[in-house]
């Protein structure tokens, strides 16, 4: 890996420290309940952080209909059809992602129903290398997570409620997008599948 390439993970870490951590651990009441952000998207500011959900919940964001809504909102918040994600973490009750939006990084905390719970803009502008390695939203399959979970249930007895979260990422070797699935019971073991959810296999 060349020196410039090393900048990308460092940038991701810096952005996560700036906005991602705060969004993932947001607590406490909000003053207003509903407002609109600069992209015209409704921001849900209820009395506290949304409840965590299990994978089998009807509103689980692992479901294609929920993930499709979230991806559409991310496109509106970002740079339209060409929006890329520097990070993308999908849990049954939330999505935490950092996307590019017309020359800036935007940290999003999305909840079921295609709603934004929190949004912040990073002062760090996207570098060319960061954008090259980021994952285009159009490559994320809304049916991938559910397909992956169904396959793991059949092969390994893993149920939707066993799922802690998934990460959409670009494989550093093949340069192809993939899903990494982590379980609640074992943080050291994860499963990898193609971005469409096909061919899941255990890693570590």
Name each model-derived stretch:
Residues 1-5:
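Positively charged n-region of N-terminal signal peptides that target proteins for export
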Residues 6-22:
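Hydrophobic membrane-insertion alpha-helices, especially the h-region
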Residues 20-33:
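Hydrophobic single-pass membrane-insertion segments
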Residues 51, 55-58, 62, 70, ...:
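Predominantly extracellular/lumenal beta-strand repeat domains
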Residues 73-108, 167-193:
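Exposed beta-strand-loop-beta-strand "reactive/processing" segments of non-cytosolic proteins
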Residues 107-125, 188-204:
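A short, surface-exposed beta-strand/turn
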